[in-house]
């Protein structure tokens, strides 16, 4: 074992003070416990150090086995060429090492109270982070693990995952300050308008470390080339190509994801919003946009900020378009009995077919636990 490999074993087996916050967050390269986002990718200290040494010392590697070696915690030192290639595929950037601009921050600022690069003294973003954290504890899976070996999703797996996400969305919305201020009819209108977009956005961001699949909350994967669920696979392919890949290219961080989700949620053009609540919704969206812009300015080089801000906002139109196709697929699944559609999904995504559309002032959605 080389000195460098001994150092990696040492850093992998000993926890830094920060690493205790990442007990369930995994390295995108080898699957070991991650200690943060390093050089553009979630990684452990071992892979972080390996990538840094490779770039700084300008190492060049050759694989003896056709560049098909498995890279995991146990075998990551077996082939440096394949390991380095995985580092690059997962988003590590040479320039982050060369210019020392890598901002090492927790990938999950919600788990340890860290602001993860948030603009100082921004109470609105702090509120959004707390809202996200309030539902994070309800999740039964960790969204940052790699999932190459995960089970192929069935139709029921897809709808089960959607049910879980919609339940979390309702609980998330209840915590939002702007949501609490509007009337019940507007609350339901916002939830219905955003429900499918929420599914698309969450699936896209959760799958940011995958290249050919959407990772669902119930530990299953929806691969874009699998023939099992052709309609859903087409949606998965669009999510990957039009949302996940751009998120990865932009190195979108969790604060930006949280803010963009809230911008999409508080849409003053959502069908069914009352005239009394319209200005409240519009004002809330404007406030979030301003905080979002300040955050992007804070974390981006000055010359890149306007383009980055625009590109992040340009993720919204494809998410809306994909969400409409997703609603159609759910409608077809219900029509032909292809999957179980629970009451919450029915009320949110197919309100015209639900059982409770007559009483708009006391919506069962808000009573869902």
Curated annotation (Swiss-Prot):
SMART domains: HOLI (SM00430), ZnF_C4 (SM00399)
Name of the coding gene: nhr-64
Subcellular location: Nucleus
Gene Ontology BP term (one): regulation of transcription by RNA polymerase II
InterPro entries in UniProt: HNF4-like_DBD (IPR049636), NHR-like_dom_sf (IPR035500), Nucl_hrmn_rcpt_lig-bd (IPR000536), Nuclear_hormone_rcpt_NR2 (IPR050274), Nuclear_hrmn_rcpt (IPR001723), Retinoid-X_rcpt/HNF4 (IPR000003), Znf_hrmn_rcpt (IPR001628), Znf_NHR/GATA (IPR013088)
UniProt keyword Calcium present: no
Function: Orphan nuclear receptor.
Swiss-Prot/TrEMBL keywords: DNA-binding, Metal-binding, Nucleus, Receptor, Transcription, Transcription regulation, Zinc, Zinc-finger
Organism field: Caenorhabditis elegans
Ranges where the NR LBD domain occurs: 120-352
Residue ranges of the TM segments: none
A GO cellular component entry from the record: nucleus
Recorded family membership: Belongs to the nuclear hormone receptor family.
Molecular function GO terms recorded: nuclear receptor activity; nuclear steroid receptor activity; RNA polymerase II cis-regulatory region sequence-specific DNA binding; zinc ion binding
The name this protein goes by in its record: Nuclear hormone receptor family member nhr-64
DNA-binding region: 67-142
Zinc fingers classed as NR C4-type: ranges: 70-90, 106-130
């Amino acid at each position: 074992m080389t000195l460098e490999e001994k150092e990696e074993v040492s850093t992998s087996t000993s926890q830094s003070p920060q690493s205790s916050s990442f007990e369930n967050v995994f390295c995108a390269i080898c699957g070991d416990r991650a200690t943060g986002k390093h050089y553009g990718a979630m990684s452990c200290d071992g892979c972080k150090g390996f990538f840094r040494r490779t770039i700084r010392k300008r190492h060049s590697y050759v694989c003896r086995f056709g560049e098909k070696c498995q890279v995991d915690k146990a075998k990551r030192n077996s082939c440096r060429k394949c390991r380095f290639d995985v580092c690059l595929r997962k988003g590590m950037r040479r320039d982050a090492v060369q210019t020392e601009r890598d901002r090492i921050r927790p990938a999950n600022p919600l788990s340890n109270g860290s602001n993860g690069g948030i603009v100082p003294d921004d109470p609105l973003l702090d509120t959004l982070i707390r809202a996200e954290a309030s539902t994070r504890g309800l999740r039964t899976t960790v969204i940052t693990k790699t999932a190459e070996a995960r089970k192929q999703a069935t139709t029921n797996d897809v709808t089960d995952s959607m049910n879980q996400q919609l339940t979390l969305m309702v609980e998330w919305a209840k915590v939002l300050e702007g949501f609490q201020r509007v009337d019940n009819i507007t609350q339901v209108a916002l939830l219905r308008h955003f429900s499918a977009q929420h599914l698309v956005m969450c699936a896209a961001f959760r799958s940011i470390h995958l290249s050919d699949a959407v990772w669902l909350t119930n530990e299953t994967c929806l691969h874009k080339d699998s023939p099992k669920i052709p309609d859903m696979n087409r949606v998965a392919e669009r999510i990957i190509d039009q949302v996940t890949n751009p998120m990865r290219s932009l190195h979108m961080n969790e604060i930006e994801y949280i803010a963009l989700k809230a911008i999409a949620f508080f849409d003053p053009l959502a069908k069914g919003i009352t005239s009394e609540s319209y200005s409240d919704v519009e004002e809330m969206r404007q406030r979030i946009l301003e905080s979002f812009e300040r955050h992007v300015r804070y974390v981006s080089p000055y010359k890149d900020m306007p383009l980055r801000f625009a590109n992040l906002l340009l993720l919204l139109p494809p998410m809306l378009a994909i969400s409409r196709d997703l609603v159609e697929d759910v409608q077809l699944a219900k029509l032909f009995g292809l999957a179980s559609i629970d009451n919450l999904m029915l009320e949110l995504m197919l309100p015209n077919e639900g059982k409770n559309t007559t009483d708009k002032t006391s919506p069962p959605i808000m009573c869902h636990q």
